[in-house]
Amino acid sequence: MNEQYKQLGVSDAVLTYGETILASLRERFDAIDAIAEANQLKVINAMQKNRVAANHFNLSTGYGYDDEGRDTLERVYADCFGAEAALVRPQITCGTHALALALGANLLPGDELLSPVGAPYDTLEEVIGIRESVGSLKEHGVSYRQVDLLPDGSFDLDGIRAAINEKTKLVTIQRSKGYATRPSFSVEQIGQLIAFCKRCKPDVICMVDNCYGEFTELTEPVNVGADMMVGSLIKNPGGGLAPTGGYICGRADLIERCARRLTAPGLGREVGANLGLLTSFYQGFFLAPTVVASAVKGAVFAAACYERLGFRVVPPAAETRHDIIQAVELGSREGMIAFCKGIQSAAPVDSYVTPEPSPMPGYDSDVIMAAGAFVQGSSIELSADGPTCPPYAVYFQGGLTWYHAKLGILMSLQKMQEAGLISL
């Protein structure tokens, strides 16, 4: 096997270093596998309960009336995640679209949106109206305020209490760190925050952006009081097979509003053809717990490898995981480029491409991205990216198989060593 690694460009020194790190992670990997097993059984139970059958994979076109496969998939999602209802559609194009849909469906002029966990993803700034944009919530009369986290990364409960007022209609909680170096939140932490917000205003809607977090723990935000939970099918729940799509699940009345926003009042969830994508949606969801476990193992391995070399990693290698993202602060633009070159060179697709920093809409700095994916933009497939500015953090995620994630990390070390940025 060592010879096969050498053929792919991994030196003996890097391979030996990687195996030394791996030997220290056996118990961690066993714990990750235990979570995957429990979540796999949860998915199977939801599929069996809803009597998933071969006819549920049939193509529908046009209006999509009476699409039993689509409707059954939504019941599977709802049951698996512990929600009253779910909307799972290829017409929801990405995570940002799903979030914009959930917000737009449940916020009216005069309402206020609150983020108690600081600034949202950059892509949501135009949705909200933090940056001026046509069609934003701000343009439609929805105000916004945020409460930043405390310096130690904990919730500013006094600030949140002061921010919640009679106009506060919806609280949005971003589970994952995004392009930040704060810790991602556990389901338990999210539950505590939701309970606090509900004590301040019992009728406030609590929505969780669950992107990158599905199946990393035994429970999901809906299980601890979230009224809505939102995510993308080209991330965790699509299992690497879904070619597009997003989901929203939670309270039935809120999900119905989302359905009517997605299509039209009077139509709601009754229309929306599946366009032949249901097999990939069902099979991807079935595989998702195992695929997510592979990605989590890759994140833990990356953290352990780079932490021992003296780099700051978020979360630390020994910390329990709440999403699939691993941030590594490499300290220089050159380090980010070398790391991403390693990830790209390990890809099954476009392995010959050399990633370079380049401008990207919505970002003040050039962004570098490495991804050789079967599905464009898929974050559950092995990838790495980040803005090339201090602290020069690269965000590593994904890996449909653990062995691919392992190769990616070894190749990142190889490129870092060849650039003279690390010594093994």
Residue locations for each model-derived region?
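Conserved C-terminal alpha-helix-loop-beta "cap" of PLP-dependent enzymes
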Residues: 307-424
